Amino acid sequence: MKKPNILFLMCDEHRFDVLGYAGNRIIKTPVLDSLAKQAVVFNNAYTPSPICIPARQCLMSGCLPKHCGCEEYGQDLPAGSMTFARCLAAAGYETVACGKLHHMGGDQMQGWTMRMGADIKIDPHYIPTRQKSAQADYKIAGFEKWSNAKEIKRAGVGENCAAQAADSYALSGALNFIKDRFVDAYYDRANTEQPLLLKVSFNRPHYPYFTSEEKFSYYLNRVPLYDKDTVFDHPFLSRHRVQIGKDVSEREARRAVAAYYGMIESADSDFGTIIEALEHAGQNIDDWIIIYTSDHGEMLGQHGVWEKQKFFEASVKVPLFIRWPKKFTAHRVEKNVNLCDIFATLCELTGTSVPEGLDSRSLVPLMETAGAPWDNETVSHFKDVGGFANVMIKKDNLKYQYYGETDSEVLFDLLKNPTETQNFIDDDTYCEAVRRFRLKKNELGY
């Protein structure tokens, strides 16, 4: 059987509920909404780490941060590590990546046979003797930036020139590749039957929050202020809180949210351009597997917090759908899944053997039947400045969090308290669940 072509679409920092198909009536995402209508949508997909680089390395490797050695910002996979791109390339795929991958180390390809992106570089801090101090320097600087609300205050109409140029380069690279591979008579097609994995990954809607005047004007008085009065006091979760009326004005917060929405709409439009290019090149996209996701979410001021690096739903939960209408009927899955699971899923969908030692579970059973048997647990974790462990374990509707020996544990019950404002960790009703979570945390090595 001929292996299917795969289109893997990805954004950076896309909050799970800022999508039309997720029930958001304000955002305009017609392309992703249309794709999702014929897809299996995972309503409870989580990132293995709510930090950019670890999340992406876990996605590539199919392993949790502790198991792939990427627990902190700036850590990259060891050269030659098994990735889903390397695995599919070995199985005969042409693997092409356009746009942001955020690989920091010496292995800039990680199994991609072709790569077009503005972030192809080895970070100068990725030198073993300097790595620890470099990460600490980066994070401390980042905390100062967050604490003075710089990104919120400067948000609005404008351009993030570097990110915009990178996304334009990713889009043009994808369009030129599609033309070369499927249309141009001069393209070298020694193996016309070779299957293709094409990944297109944008920076948007990662801050800085800038968008066009047209989109900004449309969203400014429509977007919500995300639970500005809803807070949860905790030494880590409430760190670097930005208070409306004190640190920023309500208008400034609204400007940032409006710009964020505009960035998502523009990314959606560019995804549509890619789909149109494939169709104009004679491709039937119903024959393709199409995946959409993000590395993590964005707080957008919920609980008074912006950006990511939290285990609140807005930060740790991600959009995820997989579309292959000729094989799977559209439906929604409520089970807890993880970005790590994409590796094993791609292997099963393409008839490729799954490498040993992964934390990845194939999602195919859930794609076939939403209620298929499933261990309804998922994990996310990272290390803070100083190497302190932060761990989240979600089982069914309960979400446990561990922040080392000094900060208190947290237990959210998303069924009883979906806004995540009440800590049930000391509630006797949950004592057995807490005991099991602590055992699992110990099994993870924390």
Short names for language-model regions:
Residues 415:
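Residues forming the ATP-binding cleft of Hanks-type serine/threonine protein kinase domains
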Residues 444-446:
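Short arginine-rich
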Residues 1-401, 408-409, 418-442:
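Formylglycine-dependent sulfatase
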